[in-house]
Amino acid sequence: MTASLTQQKIRIRLKAFDRRMLDLSCDKIIQTADTTAASAIGPIPLPTKRKIYCVLRSPHVDKDSREHFETRTHRRIIDIYSPSAKTIDALMKLDLPSGVDIEVKL
């Protein structure tokens, strides 16, 4: 069974440490999809992943004195329905910041 172009869906998963950069990238992707007559749903926010690192402050003793650092990974999903070849070309030519990780599934 082959799916026609009207039934296809592109799922774009975005990850970044900076929420503002992630939202700007989502806006660019949605604007690109809208200009090529494809319907975009999203951005759908996913839960933020927190990774906490615990480090001893002193190099020798004083195990009671510790310092905590954390990284937060913000994630979003955008679904693009009924994409055309023009939509895919426009998405490939899109210039996004280097701090945003993009994963595309067809």
From Swiss-Prot:
Keywords noted in UniProt: Ribonucleoprotein, Ribosomal protein
GO molecular function: structural constituent of ribosome; tRNA binding
GO cellular component, one term: ribonucleoprotein complex
Domain of life: Bacteria
InterPro entries assigned to the protein according to its UniProt record, in alphabetical order: Ribosomal_uS10 (IPR001848), Ribosomal_uS10_dom (IPR027486), Ribosomal_uS10_dom_sf (IPR036838)
Database matches in Pfam families: Ribosomal_S10
GO biological process: translation
Subunit: Part of the 30S ribosomal subunit.
Family label: Belongs to the universal ribosomal protein uS10 family.
Function as written in the Swiss-Prot or TrEMBL entry: Involved in the binding of tRNA to the ribosomes.
The protein's name in its UniProt record: Small ribosomal subunit protein uS10
Species this protein is from: Prochlorococcus marinus subsp. pastoris (strain CCMP1986 / NIES-2087 / MED4)
Lineage of the organism: Bacteria, Bacillati, Cyanobacteriota, Cyanophyceae, Synechococcales
